[in-house]
C-alpha cells in the first residue's frame, strides 16, 4: 500500500498550515520543495528562481522531489507531502515551459497514494510573502494546472473544503480512514 499522501493546489490555499498541524499531531510530513529551492537560491544569489529562470527553478524542484520521495518512502509510515513531482509538471504547463521526457517518465514512475488532496483557491487567506510573489489570479490558474496534471497521471482528486485548519485536518483524516489508508 502506498502511504505517501499528497496535498496540491495553488499557492496560498492553506496546504502548509494543514501540514504544520499534522506535524503537531505527530505525523511525518515532507515540506514544500519550492520554498526550499527559493530560500537556497536567494541565499546563494542564484538564478533558479521563478522570477529569474523558470526552467532552472523547475529542474531544481524536480531534483528535490526525487530526493524527498526516496527518503520518505523508506519510512514505511504515513507521510504527508506538501506538493510532489507532479506539481513540477503542472508548473511547467502553467508557465508554458518545455517538458523534458525525463520529467514525464518520473511522474509515471514515482507514485504516491491515490487520492490526492487538492486545496482550492481561497482569497480570504491568500497572502504574498518573500517566496510567494504570485497574485490571486495566478493562484487560480495554478489550481487549474494542478487538476490537469494530476488527472493526466491518473490521480483522483479530493477537494479540501474551505474551513478551519482543524476541520480540514479532520476532513483529510476521515477520508483516509474511509479508504483504509490509515
Language model: regions and residue ranges:
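Conserved substrate/cofactor phosphate-moiety recognition/catalytic segment
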Residues: 23-64
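Walker A (P-loop) phosphate-binding loop of P-loop NTPases
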Residues: 12
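Hydrophobic anchor at the beta1->P-loop junction of P-loop NTPases
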Residues: 7
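Pre-Walker A (Motif I) flank of P-loop NTPase domains
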Residues: 1-4
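A glycine- and Lys/Arg-enriched "phosphate-lid" helix/loop adjacent to the NTP-binding pocket
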Residues: 96-163
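Conserved lysine of the Walker
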Residues: 15
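Glycine-rich phosphate-binding loop used to anchor ATP phosphates in small-molecule kinases
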Residues: 58-111, 126
Amino acid at each position: 500500500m502506498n502511504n505517501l499522501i499528497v496535498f496540491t493546489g495553488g499557492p496560498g490555499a492553506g496546504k502548509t498550515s494543514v501540514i504544520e498541524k499534522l506535524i503537531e499531531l505527530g505525523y511525518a510530513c515532507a515540506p514544500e520543495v519550492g520554498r526550499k529551492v527559493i530560500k537556497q537560491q536567494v541565499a546563494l544569489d542564484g538564478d533558479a528562481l521563478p522570477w529569474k529562470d523558470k526552467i532552472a527553478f523547475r529542474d531544481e524542484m524536480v531534483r528535490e522531489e526525487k530526493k524527498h520521495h526516496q527518503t520518505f518512502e523508506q519510512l514505511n509510515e504515513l507521510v504527508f507531502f506538501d506538493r510532489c513531482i507532479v506539481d513540477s509538471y503542472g508548473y511547467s504547463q502553467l508557465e508554458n515551459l518545455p517538458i523534458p521526457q525525463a520529467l514525464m517518465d518520473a511522474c509515471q514512475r514515482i507514485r504516491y497514494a491515490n487520492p490526492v488532496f487538492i486545496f482550492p483557491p481561497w482569497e480570504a487567506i491568500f497572502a504574498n510573502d518573500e517566496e510567494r510573489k504570485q497574485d490571486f489570479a495566478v493562484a487560480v490558474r495554478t489550481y487549474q494546472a494542478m487538476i490537469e496534471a494530476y488527472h493526466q497521471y491518473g490521480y483522483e482528486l479530493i477537494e479540501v473544503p474551505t474551513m478551519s485548519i482543524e476541520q480540514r485536518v479532520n476532513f483529510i483524516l476521515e477520508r483516509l480512514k474511509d479508504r483504509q489508508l490509515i
